[in-house]
């Protein structure tokens, strides 16, 4: 994989001004983004998140998933901490793309869960890859991470490229009546680490 750093700009947000670093995968044409806040240390653990693109959750406020809630909470946590990063990877629909994701949603509307829908379309449950994160982390100077995730595959991906995951910080937000079954499937079939309280009815 050939990841090329392109440019950096300021990104004002409701939580403060982040820096937005653009990267291009010259083999696939995919464009990825690293958001950083404050001064990042190469010696001390840095709060961060690997976030896969979710147009419906991140930009269209969908309640079918928890992605948008996780992104906003991660950005807020980073701003409150004073420093941190988000690697925003263009892997829509756990890697199957936007239109296939809509096809999968159609199957879910008919009763399939998120894993079954992917498989009925001929895809694995999760097609995401994380090999692009190494050059991105090298560019922003991060070697030790407090990783905001419920996904053990992301912890493994960090460790495999030599990044020390000092702490896994749970990110359990956004549960609602539209996504509760989806969250249960992520826990039971995709191995996401979520505590039982996340599935109890809210008052």
Curated annotation (Swiss-Prot):
| Ligand binding (GTP) | 49-53, 70, 92-94, 114, 149, 154
| Catalysis: reaction(s) | GTP + 4 H2O = 2,5-diamino-6-hydroxy-4-(5-phosphoribosylamino)-pyrimidine + formate + 2 phosphate + 3 H(+)
Cofactor(s) recorded for this entry are:
Zn(2+)
One GO term (biological process): riboflavin biosynthetic process
How is its cofactor bound, per UniProt?
A: Binds 1 zinc ion per subunit.
EC number, as in UniProt? 3.5.4.25
Kindly list the positions annotated as binding Zn(2+): 54, 65, 67
Write out the GO cellular component annotations: cytosol
The disulfide bonds in this chain are: none
Give UniProt keywords alphabetically.
GTP-binding, Hydrolase, Metal-binding, Nucleotide-binding, Riboflavin biosynthesis, Zinc
Query: Which Gene3D superfamilies is this protein grouped with?
Result: GTP cyclohydrolase II
Tell whether Coiled coil is among the UniProt keywords: no
Its annotated function is as follows: Catalyzes the conversion of GTP to 2,5-diamino-6-ribosylamino-4(3H)-pyrimidinone 5'-phosphate (DARP), formate and pyrophosphate.
Q: Please name the PANTHER family in this protein's record.
A: 3,4-DIHYDROXY-2-BUTANONE 4-PHOSPHATE SYNTHASE (PTHR21327:SF18), GTP CYCLOHYDROLASE II-RELATED (PTHR21327)
Q: What is this protein called?
A: GTP cyclohydrolase-2
- The species is Shewanella sp. (strain MR-4)
Q: Gene encoding this chain?
A: ribA
